[in-house]
Amino acid sequence: MLFRSKDAPALQAWYKRHLGIDVQAWGGAAFEWSDAEGKPIAGTTAWLINPAESKQFDPSKASFMVNYRVEDLHALVKALKEEGCDVLDKIDESEYGKFGWVIDPEGNKVELWQPPAGQ
């Protein structure tokens, strides 16, 4: 989950103080997954607060962006395009995985993330 904030450092501090979220220098936190018994399993949920002027949310004007973990980004992007969805042409690939984006019918930018193998 990604948020856009008018005062990112202050909002990050609020979440850290009141909800105990361990906000890192990059502006967010990563929550490791576990099963119902508390045993670690592969996966993380990213949580991030960005400054209001961040271009990461463009072309959406929303103050948030949801990130969905996907199994095969290239196949999903292809299917979404075939279904007539507004898919951004850019796909980013890095050590953090593959990232793509689609705009939902209300204009919200949705991030699609395929993690690296083994995560």
Where do the PLM segments sit?
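Vicinal oxygen chelate
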Residues: 1-6, 22-26, 34, 52-119, ...
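Core segments of cupin and vicinal oxygen chelate
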Residues: 2-46, 82
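Short, solvent-exposed coil/turn segments
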Residues: 26, 42, 59-63, 95
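Generic structural signal for residues positioned in beta-strands
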Residues: 30, 46-48, 65, 111
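Active-site donor-binding loop signature of nucleotide-sugar glycosyltransferases
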Residues: 33-35, 51, 93, 114-115
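Short secondary-structure boundary/capping segments
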Residues: 37-40, 55-58, 91
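Short amphipathic beta-strand starts and helix->beta connectors
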Residues: 47-52, 85
